[in-house]
Amino acid sequence: VLVDLRAMREGWLIVANVKDRAQMCGIFGYVGQPAEVGPMVLGALKQLEYRGYDSWGVAARDGGHVAVEKQAGKIGTAAVTLPTSSIGFGHTRWATHGGVTDTNAHPHLDERGRLAVIHNGIIENFRELRDELIARGHQFRSDTDTEVVVHLIEDLVEAGASLADATRQTFGRLHGLNAIIVMDVTQNELVAVKTISPLIVGLGRGANYVASDTTALVEYTRDVVYLEDNQVAVIRPDEVILLDLHSGAPLPLRRERVDWEVGDMGLGGYPDFMSKEMAEQGRVVRQVATGYGDYVRALADTIWESYGTFLVGCGTASYAALTGSYLFSRIARRHVNAVLGSEFKYQEHFLTDRSLALALSQSGETADIIEAMVTSRARGAKIGALVNVRGSTLDRMADLSIPLGAGPEQCVLSTKAYIAKLAILTLTAHTLAGTAEIGRDILLRAADALDRFLAEGGSARVRAVAEQIVKADHLYIIGRGLNYPTALEAALKIKEVSYVHAEGFAAGELKHGVIALLTEGTPCLVFAPMDETRADILSGAMEMKSRGGLMIGISPQYDPVFDIHLPVADVGDASPIVNALPAQLLGYHLARLRGYDPDKPRNLAKSVTVK
């Protein structure tokens, strides 16, 4: 899907449906006065490492050639020794083409060491292009799709094209959703172009920047240009020129100001970002309860006026959406549809010009959700967004965008952004029902309960449980009603971070096959709130126990069916919020006990721009 955000805002739209993909990588570039570009670029990449951490690389001009340092693995405590330079860029990779090796890390150079390229995306026709280039005598060093770009540009530059024109022509030959930045050591400029994969140009004084995320720019400037699809940016120390990809005609520069605080990017004394971000969840819920009245009233009014509301998410966000469907039904007596972003296209025929499509996304860049929103707009529906990253694609394309306000979430796993979504949806449902004060009250109780759980040794209690089950191969989790999605999210969190096979189920489905999986000693997690689901949940837990399950109850009140009880506060309809924390901690401690990094699980990246 190719998106023209300006066109969407102005009421017209051009959409091209394509079977393309973009990968998740972090990009940062600088052009300006001579500086220690190596440490500058590497520092920015550390802030972007959540986008990919298979390998990394930086490059700078060193006289008449490109100096490069790159290696496989996480950045960690790495340092670089690149020379002082007026131009440099870097890349942190999430591998899709070619193994995780030093050679396959970006940047990639032409054969003369004059040009360098970094790339985010997947070039669908790279084999065809590679064969063509090999036939013309080009030598390839890597197994990546990216390297075809630098060789194509090399041929055009040697034939007399400017760097901008060579980049335009090359990008036009690439099939897929891609973003590239090109450096030519004979020119003091970077050239950038993209489709879907985000690129933001930072406008400084005597220097300009480009990055895949605003968080990497705000240390240097808050004046930015969000590069739109099929725009080419020529970035020089004293100017930025925008060109149309197809015609090469100049385009107006739409300068915007980053007027929000990015938040604390440091560990703040915590051993890792996951533990820090779990500890911040009470603050996040309290912030929604006390400061989001206008936001939720606007969202409640929009839902009230809509005929057909779709909550659209992927992964953790999809479970927040599913919880939302229960909240609106239970509290506001309003039917809303929870739909996976990747499955939305199969239900789009229900959309009308009175529908509301509400996107839930931490990054605001999730490709499947962007596609769903573009489809919704094409059918005349209103677009809403709950996003954590201000200035992201979904934030800018929405008619109504509500910031999650969770602050930077640098652990690849989503914790506090998930909780923020639940809090906003809970308060919106109560506002729609005319019981906003009740909603605020239960959120404040939930915020206090989250803080109290940690302050009163909850993490240590969960660690003791993790020590007891650390060698288990399987973990099964049940919930009902509001806490059925909680069971699904708990299973996802545990398997993402600890690599223990975990599955969540609706408790009523036990008799329909799930119970066949249980063996003696299998750990089973049970969410048993003090609501109308409790009796049935405990009955299901007894069935599991009778088949040998080790029952771990997350509940405000002990029950004899529990072999282990993890007490939580009774906060009514906010129970999914307080129940999430023990499950997050269980995954965290299992990961630590098994020797895994909770911030950077294998094969995962946070900003999922892959379709």
Positions of PLM-derived features:
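Internal helix-turn-beta structural module
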Residues: D570-R592, Y596-P598
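Active-site phosphate/pyrophosphate-binding segments
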Residues: M274, E280-F310, R379, L400-P523, ...
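Short helix-capping/linker segments at secondary-structure and domain boundaries
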Residues: P34-V37, D155-S162, N188-E189, H430-G439, ...
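Acidic/histidine-rich
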Residues: L177-A207, V470-E496, D531-T533, L538
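Glycine-rich phosphate-binding loops that contact phosphosugars or nucleotide phosphates
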Residues: D301-R445, R480, F527-D573, L586
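Conserved short alpha-helical segments that host acidic/polar catalytic motifs at enzyme active sites
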Residues: L13-L267, P271, E280, R286-T290, ...
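Glycine-rich oxoanion-binding loops at beta->alpha junctions
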Residues: H91-T103, R286-A300, G324-L360, T366, ...
